[in-house]
Structures are given as structure tokens and as C-alpha cells.
Amino acid sequence: MDVDKLIEAGKIAKKVREEAVKLAKPGVSLLELAEKIESRIVELGGKPAFPANLSLNEVAAHYTPYKGDQTVLKEGDYLKIDLGVHIDGYIADTAVTVRVGMDFDELMEAAKEALESAISVARAGVEVKELGKAIENEIRKRGFNPIVNLSGHKIERYKLHAGVSIPNIYRPHDNYVLQEGDVFAIEPFATTGAGQVIEVPPTLIYMYVRDAPVRMAQARFLLAKIKREYKTLPFAYRWLQGEMPEGQLKLALRSLERSGALYGYPVLREIRGGMVTQFEHTIIVEKDSVTVTTE
């Protein structure tokens, strides 16, 4: 593990997150904001570890704009900005919620305090369910619900989701014990809704999983490009727009997804249409505490 690269990725992620918050004003287009976030990451010496996720209101995650997207920010929107930076595969993952044109409110505070509470109990030897308990308590005591089917995640080199989850609720069977040197993203989501997300179209983010035989020449071309440029990290539909006509691109991606070569991440929406907030940091677990790389 290269701690220096993890720390540097975290510094870039923090800076870009803070700049993105200042840019999130009424009338700004999601496309413009996403492109600024991603190009700024590169300017500062990193690469996007995944597409900028810009999810509004009842959409909790996995929305990234496409070329031609007309969505603009409106006053009162809850905008989740979730961005990732990697240096040589060493990842920092961070998120913040902005209430566009308005002040910080209780729903935002619930997710932010939940994150801080979870970080304060994290250290080597602690079971992840204790972090889930801390998150759930902070959100529920403010009268909101944690989103039960979204969670934080272990991070490894070139692997955004490395198999272990940090739940946003207390679950007795979540007994993975944090180890010194583990890298985790902790990301509480709070909602005014039921506390559950469902998958809805469209799918705007994909990830390479494995090689698989596909007939379509365009699909083979696309797969080679994806492996070369993004390796095992998520990428945006938008990043491939312009590679071939739109209809062919959609067909090629569908064919690659069906074959198991790619995994698609549909947009995630709160099941009852409740408003959703999110805050996230990346931590390196130490013996008696953690290092927060994105703070």
C-alpha cells in the first residue's frame, strides 16, 4: 500500500469537493459541473476514480450527466456531489450535500454528524456494526431515516468496492473487524423517506468486470478501450459519447452488459421519493484512530 499516494489523492479530492460546492449555484447545469469537477481532478495531478455523481433530491446515487443533458440546478435542490480521485490506482472517495441557494439544514446535518460519529469510533479492532450503530443513532435521533440498502465500502488499489461494507444501520451480523491499514469510504445517507433505494433507469455508469466473447465489432472495440483507459474503475456513458453514433454505443454497451463483461449501475432513487442527503470521507484505519484522507 502506498500511503503517500492515498494521502495525495485525498488532498486533491478535498480541494475539488470544496471548489464544487462553491460552483453549485442556481442555473448551473449538471453537465458543466461534472466536467469542471473531472477536469479539475486532472489539473491537480489525479485522475477521476469514477464519474462525478451529481444526484438531486430523491435520487440518492449513480446519476452522472450525459452529453446533451439539460438538467440545471434550482434553488432548494438537495445536490449530492460524490467524487473520486485516484493516483496510480490509490483512491480517495468523498461526498458532500449542498442545498442549492439555501443554508445548511437538519437533513444535511443528520448525514454529516452521522459521518463524524462513525469516524470517531473507527479504529483497528472495532467491528463495522459499531460504525453502523453510530450512523443510525445520529440520523434517527433527528427524526430521519438512514438508507438501509446503501453502505460505505472497503477500498483497494483500482478497486472502489473491495467486498466489505460499512452499513448505515446496526446489524448484529456485520462483524468484520477493522484492521490496521484498511482503507474504507464511510458514507451515511439520511432521508425524509422510507430509508430504502430502488434502481431506476437510466444507467449512466458502468464498470469492467471480465472479458467475454461478443459478436458486435463495436462492442469489442469499446471493451478494449474501457480496459485500457479505466481498468476496473467505474466510467461514464458520457466519456464514451462521440466514440461512435449514439444508437451503436447504446447497443454495444447493452451487449457488453448482457455478456457479463460490464456491470451497469442504474440510478438509485429513494423508494417513496423522500429527499436524500449524503456525506462521505475516506479513512485509513490505524491502531488507535484513523487518518481521514479527504478532510
From Swiss-Prot:
Covalent S-S links between cysteines: none
NCBIfam families: met_pdase_II
GO molecular function (one): initiator methionyl aminopeptidase activity
Entry keyword annotation includes Hydrolase: yes
Record-given protein name: Methionine aminopeptidase
EC numbers on record: 3.4.11.18
Residues involved in a divalent metal cation 2 binding: 93, 153, 187, 280
Keywords for this protein: Aminopeptidase, Hydrolase, Metal-binding, Protease
Positions of substrate binding: 62, 161
Enzyme class: hydrolase
Catalyses which reaction(s): Release of N-terminal amino acids, preferentially methionine, from peptides and arylamides
Oligomer status and interactors: Monomer.
Binding residues for a divalent metal cation 1: 82, 93, 280
GO cellular component: cytoplasm
